[in-house]
């Protein structure tokens, strides 16, 4: 599959293997105790060994301190660190200097002004992940099953490398790709039967929908 597809919040060998067999380019393991997708570093490391070299391994953290990152990086040996909290550019630079790993920085989007937060990170992060802002009362920065208005990305500079996230599933991924021209997508709740429970049939449907969308849009991936 030409597009980067990340299945996030993986917790079982069955789900990890199935995601990669379908063509997932990235596998995400979440280290955030409040999340139903939280996994212990050693458990994630064992799962990652099953698919290492076949897909990128992403450690998803939320405002983690160095001690926590030390444990996660040691156990998982990730290819990418995804920082999904309020980490500022200085913190991103520090993390990159310590661990020598590419960093994907998540930014929450609800309105056009949220895109102003991109500039301070340019030249620092290796890729952005654009997620929807969590609903009121949610303790989770992502994985809430909500989307943002994808048309907001019309104003985005075409040179910005990003992964589209936020409530993506088999029913809406076609529209999301048509509107944004995204070359990388992320899903978690969109392939679950319950919070934290990956559904293999929903994974199948998601990848089928991505392939259908890829087949009908311009080769360049530009917006139609």
Swiss-Prot record:
Its EC number is 5.3.1.24. GO terms for molecular function: phosphoribosylanthranilate isomerase activity. It catalyses: N-(5-phospho-beta-D-ribosyl)anthranilate = 1-(2-carboxyphenylamino)-1-deoxy-D-ribulose 5-phosphate. One of its GO terms (biological process) is L-tryptophan biosynthetic process. Pathway: Amino-acid biosynthesis; L-tryptophan biosynthesis; L-tryptophan from chorismate: step 3/5. The keyword Amino-acid biosynthesis applies. Keywords: Amino-acid biosynthesis, Aromatic amino acid biosynthesis, Isomerase, Tryptophan biosynthesis. It is an enzyme of class 5 (isomerase). InterPro entries: Aldolase_TIM, PRAI_dom, RibuloseP-bd_barrel, TrpF_fam. HAMAP family: PRAI. Belongs to the TrpF family. PANTHER family: N-(5'-PHOSPHORIBOSYL)ANTHRANILATE ISOMERASE (PTHR42894:SF1). This is N-(5'-phosphoribosyl)anthranilate isomerase. The gene is trpF.
């Amino acid at each position: 599959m030409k597009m980067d597809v990340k299945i996030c919040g993986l917790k079982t060998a069955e789900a990890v293997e199935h995601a990669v067999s379908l063509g997932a380019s990235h596998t995400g393991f979440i280290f955030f105790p409040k999340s139903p997708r939280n996994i212990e570093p050693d458990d994630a490391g064992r799962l990652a060994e099953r698919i290492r070299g076949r897909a990128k391994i992403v450690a998803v953290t939320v405002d983690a301190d160095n001690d926590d990152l030390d444990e996660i990086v040691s156990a998982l040996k990730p290819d990418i660190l995804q920082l999904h909290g309020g980490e500022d550019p200085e913190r991103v630079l520090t993390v990159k200097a310590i661990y020598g790993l590419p960093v994907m920085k998540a930014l929450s989007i609800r309105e056009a002004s949220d895109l102003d937060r991109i500039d301070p990170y340019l030249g620092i992060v290796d890729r952005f992940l654009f997620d929807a802002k969590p609903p009121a009362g949610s303790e989770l920065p992502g994985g809430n099953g909500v989307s943002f208005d994808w048309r907001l990305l019309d104003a985005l500079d075409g040179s910005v490398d990003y992964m589209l996230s936020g409530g993506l599933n088999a029913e809406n991924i076609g529209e999301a790709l048509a509107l944004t021209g995204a070359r990388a997508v992320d899903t978690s709740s969109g392939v679950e039967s319950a919070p934290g429970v990956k559904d293999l049939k929903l994974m199948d449907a998601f990848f089928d929908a991505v392939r259908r969308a890829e087949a009908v849009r311009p080769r360049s991936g530009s917006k139609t």
